[in-house]
């Protein structure tokens, strides 16, 4: 365990987190560019923590003990004793600076721990709980960096996170199935009589139903934009718009997510940033 309290070490830690975000955060990073330097650094620190959570849970031979050690490292870092990982000083500084409730980070770890073994979600209630832990708590975390005053922002950030994760699930049907993970509720699959390995009319009807669910959560969370600090609104708008465009591309492909991974191209993300900047 090491204590990195000097300014140079904190700067190096933020640089490390920025490198992770720049290389791995395909959708998030673009929206970070619209924030102030301090906010952008904070977002990168939070993203780096999230990325490590995912990577630990998805590593070959991953085990609960690895995530338990990560949880213990988190507790030590939050007390100012930094384990031997360069992300911790920046992460701890961000949590303190923006007064982010620490329990969110343990909920993130609890969420990804469910991916250590093959899983099949049975009901939408079960799916909602999963989405809350792996996505809504992320939204609840980052609105502290955006800045807000009304407690209504918390409920809306939760709904926005649900919308994002439902979008991710639609995009990743093939990849998740190959890894033994089925997040689309079994009750919905049975209702439509669909096979997640076969792109036919029943598959399209199922994914169309799930896409409408995501759209409903996007619509319910719409007032969030007016509740975050004005300086942060362009970034949040861009992030939501990128995810909505991803969902739209999935829909316009007739849900052809088995043949390819659908993405929002870089040029379109840059156009969204330009619109957010100058509108």
Q: Language-model segments: what does each one mean?
A:
Residues 1-166, 170, 174-279:
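Catalytic cores of Mg2+-dependent Asp-rich isoprenoid enzymes
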């Amino acid at each position: 365990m090491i204590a990195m309290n000097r300014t140079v070490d904190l700067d190096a830690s933020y640089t490390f987190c920025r490198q992770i975000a720049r290389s791995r955060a395909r959708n998030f990073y673009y929206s970070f560019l619209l924030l102030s330097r301090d906010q952008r650094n904070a977002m990168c620190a939070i993203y780096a923590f999230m990325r490590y959570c995912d990577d630990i849970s998805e590593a070959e031979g991953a085990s609960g003990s690895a995530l338990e050690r990560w949880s213990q490292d988190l507790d030590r870092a939050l007390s100012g004793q930094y384990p031997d990982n360069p992300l911790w000083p920046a992460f701890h500084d961000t949590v303190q600076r923006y007064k982010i409730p620490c329990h969110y980070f343990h909920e993130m770890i609890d969420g990804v721990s469910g991916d250590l073994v093959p899983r099949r979600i049975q009901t939408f209630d079960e799916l909602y709980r999963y989405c809350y832990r792996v996505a809504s708590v992320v939204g609840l975390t980052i609105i502290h960096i955006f800045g807000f005053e009304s407690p209504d922002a918390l409920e809306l950030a939760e709904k926005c996170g649900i919308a994002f994760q439902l979008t991710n699930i639609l995009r990743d049907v093939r990849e998740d199935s190959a890894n033994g993970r089925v997040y689309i509720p079994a009750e919905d699959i049975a209702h439509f009589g669909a096979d997640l390995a076969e792109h036919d009319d029943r598959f399209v009807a199922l994914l169309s139903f799930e896409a409408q669910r995501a759209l409903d959560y996007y619509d319910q969370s719409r007032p969030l934009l007016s509740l975050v600090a004005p300086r942060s609104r362009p970034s949040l708008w861009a992030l939501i718009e990128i995810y909505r465009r991803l969902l739209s591309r999935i829909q316009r492909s007739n849900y052809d997510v088995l043949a390819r991974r659908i993405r929002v191209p870089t040029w379109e993300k840059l156009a969204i940033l330009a619109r957010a900047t100058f509108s």
